[in-house]
Amino acid sequence: MVKETQYYDILGVKPSASPEEIKKAYRKLALKYHPDKNPDEGEKFKLISQAYEVLSDPKKRDIYDQGGEQAIKEGGSGSPSFSSPMDIFDMFFGGGGRMTRERRGKNVVHQLSVTLEDLYNGITKKLALQKNVICEKCEGIGGKKGSVEKCPLCKGRGMQVHIQQIGPGMVQQIQTVCIECKGQGERINPKDRCENCSGAKVTREKKIIEVHVEKGMKDGQKILFHGEGDQEPELDPGDVIIVLDQKDHSVFQRRGQDLIMKMKIQLSEALCGFKKTIKTLDDRVLVISSKSGEVIKHGDLKCIRNEGMPIYKAPLEKGVMIIQFLVVFPEKQWLSQEKLPQLEALLPPRQKVRITDDMDQVELKEFNPNEQSWRQHREAYEEDDEEPRAGVQCQTA
């Protein structure tokens, strides 16, 4: 049981969330609250990054679960600092850290919503993007030739350094973006600024790109368009990174290259046999049936070879389709008392129990999970969902 849930709440996941669920939550929130899209949500973006940095690291997550945020700040092992939110974002989306990008423009990251059918069959989607391009009129100078001068306030560094007192005899040095040149290190007299870009050196341009989603690609996979990102003077253009975001499917769940589904069958079908149909992601219909005399138990797993997801870059090969059977039992009093002996005669015999005088006779009651006494202890006794675990294999015979 975790001590506190603040970091989990920030990412919108449960304390029992898997590493994949944590990654997916960070991806969606980081793209939504990135300063380029939400300039006023810098603090929110920072909190999202801190939560992900802790929960994505097994050791830090264990420290947090046991001691909360205070244990993280104390370091657990002596390291109280967090990484830069932008570095976490860049490393997650494949852009590298700041030092690796210093001679290139910013990468542009976009999320593309796809269905499980899209990832199964492959699809080409057109995406309209806005990007910065070098101003054609001033050729990226920002104004008339010779009008650009070094910023007198920051001396061309683009940053200002302030000394702040934080206690008696204690000061700290704070570095901020220069308010005069907005971090550019230079300025242009307003009357000399380019009319086309207003001195910004770049203009916004709409570009349509075709995104080829190949068979077998997965949720969160990145598609790179090299050099199609924002342009900046004297820098190579950055990349456009498209991140695939798979919508939930009404029937199938994907686990690696396998497809998992749940199928309800009646008790009569579980005992006497069944014949069912399954519609695949490419609109074929599969017919499945149980063998004569075979009993299907609640929760049993069966699989169909070569009906899972196509293997990326080898689409003729596929994983398996795993079916979990859920046996639906009859409602109360579905059979009259007179017919119960007939049914019992057809079923395996009951297990005989020897009752002695020192045993306590108790009465079974209907259970209500919403009762107060249950809710207080529910977290301690949470049970796993009825889902098959990884490692299920089809038998060869």
From Swiss-Prot:
Residue numbers of Phosphoserine PTMs: S18
Positions annotated as propeptide: 395-397
GO biological process: negative regulation of endothelial cell migration; negative regulation of inclusion body assembly; positive regulation of gene expression; protein refolding; response to heat
Source organism superkingdom: Eukaryota
Modified residues (Cysteine methyl ester): C394
InterPro entries referenced in this protein's UniProt entry, alphabetically: DnaJ, DnaJ_C, DnaJ_domain, DnaJ_domain_CS, DNJA1/2-like, HSP40/DnaJ_pept-bd, HSP_DnaJ_Cys-rich_dom, HSP_DnaJ_Cys-rich_dom_sf
Region (Disordered): 366-397
Binding site for Zn(2+) 1: C135, C138, C194, C197
Topology in membrane: Lipid-anchor
Residue spans, zinc finger CR-type: 122-206
Biased composition (Basic and acidic residues): 366-380
Matches recorded under SMART domains: DnaJ
GO terms under cellular component: cytosol; membrane
Keyword flag Membrane: yes
Tissue: Specifically expressed in testis and heart.
List of residues binding Zn(2+) 2: C151, C154, C178, C181
Lipid-binding residues (covalent, S-farnesyl cysteine): C394
Pfam families per the UniProt record, alphabetical: DnaJ, DnaJ_C, DnaJ_CXXCXGXG
CXXCXGXG motif repeat intervals: 135-142, 151-158, 178-185, 194-201
Subcellular location as annotated: Membrane
Predominant location category: membrane
Keywords: Chaperone, Lipoprotein, Membrane, Metal-binding, Methylation, Phosphoprotein, Prenylation, Repeat, Zinc, Zinc-finger
Name of this chain's protein: DnaJ homolog subfamily A member 4
Species of provenance: Mus musculus (Mouse)
